[in-house]
């Protein structure tokens, strides 16, 4: 009898536990059903399909549900070049691309124009919010636009359209000399090229074996690189973004087999 009572007690407890777990789990998934899945039409931004967006502390792959371009992605199998890119910036990229806020220069570099901050997971000032306790955005240059699908949407005032040009060039080894804290901003100042391309296009890059012998010698830290003249204040960050934007394509749109862009 005691054995039967024990079995019944365990069975009842297990049943209640499963029901309760299912209830709370379903509550947490309601937000996904109501605000994310099949809600692309709830986002009314004219150019959303032709720019990249950022999703701060949101459900992974929200952009995929909405079928829009994003710098965020939970995908373990990606191109080797993506892994190399993040590694060059000193950023760990394991199974997902989720660039931290301190590498804010990566946003304009990747032509990221909008940021989505889900309102259902925390109030302003919490770590789940792009807005700090003083009401300021945690990255420079972002301005509140509107709220849709329970997402606060911010626009990048330092946005650089896709397809922009550089007039300065640095070798990969020069870029390695920049501290990780400023590498995302350094990307906005000069195009980073491997040594063979620096040499191949020396009439443009200014490369010469004599000029770069220190960089490729035993003491590369003694090389006088233009990266030492890059400034990383907020005002300089704004200036370099505006400069890149002035030298960008006048129009850009995706096509079935790539993209179409116009540059005047």
Language model features with spans:
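Cytosolic-side transmembrane helix boundary signature
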Residues: 1-4
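Extracytoplasmic/lumenal acceptor-recognition loop(s) of multi-pass membrane glycoenzymes
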Residues: 6-25, 35, 39-112, 159-222
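Short conserved active-site loop signatures built around small residues
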Residues: 29-31
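Flexible, solvent-exposed extracytoplasmic
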Residues: 106, 111-264
């Amino acid at each position: 009898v005691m054995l039967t009572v024990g079995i019944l007690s365990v069975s009842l407890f297990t049943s209640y536990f499963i029901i309760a777990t299912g209830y709370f789990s379903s509550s947490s998934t309601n937000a996904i059903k109501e605000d994310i899945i099949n809600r692309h039409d709830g986002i009314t931004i004219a150019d959303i399909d032709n720019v990249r967006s950022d999703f701060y502390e949101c459900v992974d792959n929200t952009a995929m549900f909405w079928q829009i371009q994003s710098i965020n992605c939970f995908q373990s199998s990606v191109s080797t070049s993506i892994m190399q890119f993040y590694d060059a910036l000193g950023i760990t990229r394991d199974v997902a691309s989720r660039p931290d806020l301190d590498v804010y220069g990566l946003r304009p570099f990747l032509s990221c124009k909008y940021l989505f901050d889900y309102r259902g997971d925390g109030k302003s000032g919490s770590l789940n919010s792009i807005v700090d306790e003083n009401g300021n955005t945690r990255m420079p240059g972002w301005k509140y636009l509107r709220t849709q699908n329970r997402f606060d949407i911010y626009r990048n005032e330092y946005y650089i359209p896709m397809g922009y040009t550089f007039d300065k060039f640095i070798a990969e080894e020069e870029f390695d000399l920049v501290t990780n804290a400023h590498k995302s901003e350094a990307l906005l100042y000069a195009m980073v090229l491997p040594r063979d391309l620096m040499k191949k296009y020396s009439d443009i890059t200014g490369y010469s074996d004599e000029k770069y012998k220190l960089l490729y010698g035993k003491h590369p830290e003694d090389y006088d690189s233009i990266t030492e003249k890059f400034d990383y204040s907020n005002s300089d960050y704004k200036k370099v973004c505006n400069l890149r934007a002035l030298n960008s394509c006048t129009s850009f749109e995706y096509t079935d087999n790539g993209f179409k862009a116009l540059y005047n």
